[in-house]
UniProtKB/Swiss-Prot annotation:
Gene: ZMYND12
TPR repeats: 172-205, 214-247
Gene3D superfamilies: 6.10.140.2220, Tetratricopeptide repeat domain
Phylogenetic placement of the source organism: Eukaryota, Metazoa, Chordata, Craniata, Vertebrata
Residue spans, zinc finger MYND-type: 17-54
Subcellular location: Cell projection, Cilium, Flagellum
Record-linked PROSITE patterns: ZF_MYND_1 (PS01360), ZF_MYND_2 (PS50865)
This protein's name: Zinc finger MYND domain-containing protein 12
Predominant place of localization: other
Organism of this sequence: Homo sapiens (Human)
Free-text function comment from the UniProt entry: Required for sperm flagellum function and male fertility.
Residues engaged in binding Zn(2+) 1: 17, 20, 37, 41
Amino acid sequence: MNVIYPLAVPKGRRLCCEVCEAPAERVCAACTVTYYCGVVHQKADWDSIHEKICQLLIPLRTSMPFYNSEEERQHGLQQLQQRQKYLIEFCYTIAQKYLFEGKHEDAVPAALQSLRFRVKLYGLSSVELVPAYLLLAEASLGLGRIVQAEEYLFQAQWTVLKSTDCSNATHSLLHRNLGLLYIAKKNYEEARYHLANDIYFASCAFGTEDIRTSGGYFHLANIFYDLKKLDLADTLYTKVSEIWHAYLNNHYQVLSQAHIQQMDLLGKLFENDTGLDEAQEAEAIRILTSILNIRESTSDKAPQKTIFVLKILVMFYYLMMNSSKAQEYGMRALSLAKEQQLDVHEQSTIQELLSLISTEDHPIT
């Protein structure tokens, strides 16, 4: 039974909705430790994150057992903290994935869950809360709730300002989200300032040619594209494409060499791998398909640039073991190369990609 009866709740105990913190009227029947104000929020949370972590919440929201020694108690506490850290990262990754897929409503419960565990583990004033605030801000922007997004961003900014040990990666995320806020408000001057800072801090943390830096270049390119400064936009889109090409081509070349032997020491086929988590894969799809759409709108002027992005997508989906998508983009690249009568070497390179895909024995996912 999902309904909560008020008289059955111990006196002084307040049960709150997992999504909005209003007084709870329902409980999840599967875990019995998660509460909701109504069916709408229960379904929203279930579809977003709760289904994936339902049983994992039970040991975190029930009393710790009695331990016979201090050593056992410390071990139990360490296990509890490890579970919390795992759920922080898991919920964060899922929320990021939803955002890159444009599912802003679904991202909110997952981001709230990540924030909730961060507060319990690190406290209310910790800089560790900032990534979760930024997820909630980005989700709010996607839903058109600019005032709410500003509140989350200012909370994140204030936390960073108070911190003495904030990482370059966190500074990068903060400036990227501030850039997105000002893009939504059509204040492109401020947006460019924050995205430039995003690129700087990301470069300090990961390097100028890292895929984690490419997001800043991409958003900056979008600003120049909207401002009709097409040469600047083109340069930055090319930069982003080259970063992703270098990353994916490295994985692709390693895999191609491995396939010469076909089998590993255990007699199993080598598995394709992008080296990315779910959120990064979703980000790659969003960035590369956006650039492809722009390239295709001007493919008559620079077909090589369109083919270059198509080849990146071929490698990406091949590494994801999605042969049908890889073949689709490969055929589009080959068709465009023939249509534009590009050199034979370009066509043969695409043919090699298609040949490797056609001999791949992995199932389509």
